[in-house]
Amino acid sequence: MTAAAPSKPLPRTPRVRQAYPLDYPLLLCALGLLAFGWVMVTSASMSIAEACCQNPFHYSIRHAIALGLALMLGLMAYSVPSHWWERHGVWLFLASALVLILVLIPGIGRTVNGATRWIPLGPLNVQPSEFVKLFAILYVAGYLVRHADKVVNQLSGFIRPLILIGAAALLILMQPDFGTTAVMLATVMGMLFLGGASLLPFIVLLAIVGAGLVTLVIFSPYRLERVVSFLNPWEDPFNSGYQLSQALIAFGRGEWFGVGLGNGIQKQYFLPEAHTDFLPSVIGEELGLAGMLVLIAAFVFLSWRAMSIGVRAEALKRPFESYVAQGIGLWIGLQSFVNLGVNVGILPTKGLTLPFMSYGSNSLMVGCMAVAILLRIDVMLRRVESEAKFKRGTPWSRA
């Protein structure tokens, strides 16, 4: 049987030009966390700011400036189409990994509390490891698209991206920054699993990584002290267990609804890093269990929204966007879980910030970039869905 030739060419489908709405629940959740974070940083830092800078709003003002820079960087990231990230993700990751080397060079990197993680650039302190986490997601997403068959069917396809990721992780460990390393590796492993990698390499790699982490803890007095103090902070509440015991006291004082915004006591020289890593403890004291549940719900929603965008992208045959969205969802979920877990004493102290909230310009910038990329992906998916629906509804598309 021969196919019948069409009597006349089908008319071209006209392009639909319209503005597609943003994912407002995602946007409002992120903006709400940013605003809430600024309020709580202000509350948590007033005592220490008054003591060190003779201005109770010193850290609040700096945090507000960082918020402005982060939002501008987010707008810039939103204007970048996803295919640009796909094409340049590997180069962004390599460039940020090279900057990690600069951090470790004496005279370039800045050391705070025994950790060398920053490069001073005028009034800003750039923390490359924060950007490496995001660029690692972009790199691995692009790799999974380009080498999908190898990742699924060949061990070499599974190992190749881990060589670069492992090199960056080693540089971050040398700072030292154990928490960022763990979150980045866990996020990448989750993305490889979503990419279809077989289970056996995961088991072998997890065993190797687990043995390596145990070795690092055993042979590092600094890390060993943190683990021991985490297991029983009340054994030495005025030395190795001081930070965690003070955090738990803050949660205990907060009870159900807290002592009131600004009325917390633990932030007044009792709880170290109250406006950075241990900000949730201040929230727990001043807003109680109710405030903490709202905070947890916001992070759960943000992570779920990112994952759902990834599922939609996969259904529309947009694999890069799918991997990026799900990678960002994994990263936000993991980092917020680790930070909150450290504050309530179910995980050892890691030195990780709470995304979108803790004091620190680099974390805010990377968080805003990540949300902007998610919003851009969502708008692109809405356009694809709208055009597909339009084509299905035209008479010539059904001919």
Curated annotation (Swiss-Prot):
A Gene Ontology cellular-component term: plasma membrane
Membrane topology: Multi-pass membrane protein
Gene Ontology MF term list: lipid-linked peptidoglycan transporter activity; peptidoglycan glycosyltransferase activity
First-level EC class: transferase
Residues passing through the membrane, by range: 26-46, 65-85, 89-109, 118-138, 154-174, 178-198, 199-219, 282-302, 327-347, 354-374
Database matches in Pfam families: FTSW_RODA_SPOVE
Catalysed reactions, as listed in the record: [GlcNAc-(1->4)-Mur2Ac(oyl-L-Ala-gamma-D-Glu-L-Lys-D-Ala-D-Ala)](n)-di-trans,octa-cis-undecaprenyl diphosphate + beta-D-GlcNAc-(1->4)-Mur2Ac(oyl-L-Ala-gamma-D-Glu-L-Lys-D-Ala-D-Ala)-di-trans,octa-cis-undecaprenyl diphosphate = [GlcNAc-(1->4)-Mur2Ac(oyl-L-Ala-gamma-D-Glu-L-Lys-D-Ala-D-Ala)](n+1)-di-trans,octa-cis-undecaprenyl diphosphate + di-trans,octa-cis-undecaprenyl diphosphate + H(+)
Annotated protein name in UniProt: Probable peptidoglycan glycosyltransferase FtsW
UniProt organism field: Allochromatium vinosum (strain ATCC 17899 / DSM 180 / NBRC 103801 / NCIMB 10441 / D) (Chromatium vinosum)
Gene for this chain: ftsW
